[in-house]
Structures are given as C-alpha cells and as structure tokens.
C-alpha cells in the first residue's frame, strides 16, 4: 500500500509492508508541496519517482492519504489515481470511531489528521500514556493518556518557521541554516540565531514534555518525529526519534478502518505539519 502524508513542508510518500506480522513502512521520497502544479504534473513526477524507488504500478493499487493542505488533497489523490487506476482513500474524521485512540469532541473538529496518525502509531507502540513531538512547519505536542484518549495538543512555531520569521521580520538578520550548536552563547549572528532557535527549541521540547507528563499525571513515554527531528539525533537523555511515525500511523489506520465505507478522495484535514 502507498502511504502519503501531505504536509505544509513536505509531501512524504512511503510504502507499507509486513515483517513477521508486524506493520513496517519505508519512506520512498519527499516532494515540496506546490499548489501551482497540476494533476498531470504531479502524476508524471510521482510516477517517475516511484519507478526510481523501485515501486511498480501493482504496489500503487491501494493508497491511503493524510492531508493538512486541503488545496492539494484532491490534486495529489487524483494524480495517484491517474497512475494506478484506483482512487486513494483520504483519512478523515469518518475513521475516528475505528481507531485505538479516542478524540474528544472539542479536539475532534480541529486536530490535523497527521497528529492523529502520530498518536495512533505512538499508542500502538507504547500501549500506555505518551507524548508525541512533531518537528515540522509547526512544533506540535500531542498528549495521549493511558486509556488512549487524546487529552490535547500544543502548537508552537517550527524551527524553519522561526528562522524565516526572524529573517523577514527584521532588517539585518540573515536566513540562517538550521544546525544544533554546541553552546547557547553565540559568537556571531548565525551562531546566535541557531543557539536561540535550535537550542531554544530543544529546551522547549524538554520542558513541554515534562509539563505534559505532569498534566497527564504520569512520567509517560515520549517520541519525536517530523522532518527536522534529525537535528536532535546527537542528543543524549532525549526521547527516541522515529522519522517514520506518521507513515506508521497511517499504515495502522489503513488496516483498522473499513475504508470501503468512505467515498474516496474526500477532502479532509486541518492545520498541521
């Protein structure tokens, strides 16, 4: 099955397989989201990249999409259908009743489907209360209690969003490459911005996880995901990083929900990564 995560920073394509009865996923490639591209342009690009990744047409017969970019949802779904001849299923609130996590009414109407997929993957893995941190366009924290109830979400500016905002919102600060400096004491402008944004985000993550644990009432597990989570891979005493968490969640959801109940290519999703 082809898995597609349409986010604000990347459109991530992966493929689902099984290893000893366990769901496993493999990321194939990433695209920059571009609302100006047509269905035909996306179809040609996706087909070429799938072939380069060794994925044949037969593997595209089933596709499952999460999207938090509504303007792109139908375009990409139709592009995949153009290649495979089968319309993908778009994950949305129609499926929430069939998940191992529960979403309370105030959250249900607004939570991004990518965050739901993250929560599913983490809860299936830990089988207990957990906090999921997603480092994307936004920095998000999703807290799940021991019963599988999503207690809430916190959203902050993501790393790239922060450095771009400093560049566009000031007269002299340059657009700084993202890197984790050794010290918070910047010796030049680039180092100073990296110290404040990247090191600062690291401290925010640690503090927010601790506060989520306090409000959940337990010292629960945590996991980090998202395209920029790699920046923290060298950190010790830090939660594990799982760059494939969203795709894993989609793979679990695709197996759990009766997708035949939904007319495919229904636009869904909310603000997310």
UniProtKB/Swiss-Prot annotation:
Which class of enzymes does this protein belong to?
A: transferase
Coiled-coil portions: none
What reaction does this enzyme carry out catalytically? Answer: (R)-pantothenate + ATP = (R)-4'-phosphopantothenate + ADP + H(+)
Binding-site positions, K(+): 134
Q: In which pathway does it act?
A: Cofactor biosynthesis; coenzyme A biosynthesis; CoA from (R)-pantothenate: step 1/5
Signal peptide start and end residues: none
Q: Which UniProt keywords apply?
A: ATP-binding, Coenzyme A biosynthesis, Cytoplasm, Kinase, Metal-binding, Nucleotide-binding, Potassium, Transferase
State the free-text cofactor note: A monovalent cation. Ammonium or potassium.
Cofactors named for this entry: NH4(+); K(+)
The cross-references to InterPro entries, in alphabetical order and at most eight, read: ATPase_NBD, Type_III_PanK
Entry keyword Kinase: yes
Q: Where does ATP bind?
A: 5-12, 137
Query: Which EC number(s) does UniProt give?
Result: 2.7.1.33
CC terms in the record's Gene Ontology section? cytoplasm
Annotated protein name in UniProt: Type III pantothenate kinase
Q: Gene symbol?
A: coaX
């Amino acid at each position: 099955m082809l898995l597609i995560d349409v986010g604000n920073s990347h459109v991530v394509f992966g493929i689902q397989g099984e290893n000893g009865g366990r769901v496993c996923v493999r990321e194939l490639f990433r695209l920059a989201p571009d609302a100006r591209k047509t269905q035909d342009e996306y179809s040609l690009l996706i087909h070429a990249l799938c072939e380069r990744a060794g994925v044949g047409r037969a593997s595209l017969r089933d596709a499952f999409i999460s999207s938090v970019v509504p303007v792109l949802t139908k375009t990409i779904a139709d592009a995949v259908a153009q290649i495979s001849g089968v319309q993908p299923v778009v994950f949305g609130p129609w499926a929430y009743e069939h998940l191992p996590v529960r979403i309370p009414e105030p959250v249900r109407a607004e939570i991004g489907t990518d965050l739901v997929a993250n929560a599913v993957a983490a809860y299936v893995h830990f089988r207990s209360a957990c906090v999921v941190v997603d480092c994307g366009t936004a920095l998000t924290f999703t807290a799940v209690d021991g019963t599988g109830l999503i207690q809430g979400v916190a959203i902050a500016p993501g790393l790239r969003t922060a450095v771009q905002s400093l560049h566009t919102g000031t007269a002299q600060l340059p657009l700084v490459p993202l890197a984790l400096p050794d010290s918070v004491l910047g010796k030049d402008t680039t180092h100073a911005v990296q110290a404040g944004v990247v090191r600062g985000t690291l401290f925010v993550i640690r503090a927010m996880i601790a506060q989520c644990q306090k409000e959940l009432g337990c010292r629960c597990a945590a996991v980090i995901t998202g395209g920029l989570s790699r920046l923290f891979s060298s950190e010790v005493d830090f939660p594990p990083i799982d760059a494939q968490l969203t795709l894993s969640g989609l793979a679990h959801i695709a197996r759990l929900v009766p997708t035949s109940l939904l007319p495919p290519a229904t636009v869904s999703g909310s603000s997310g990564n």
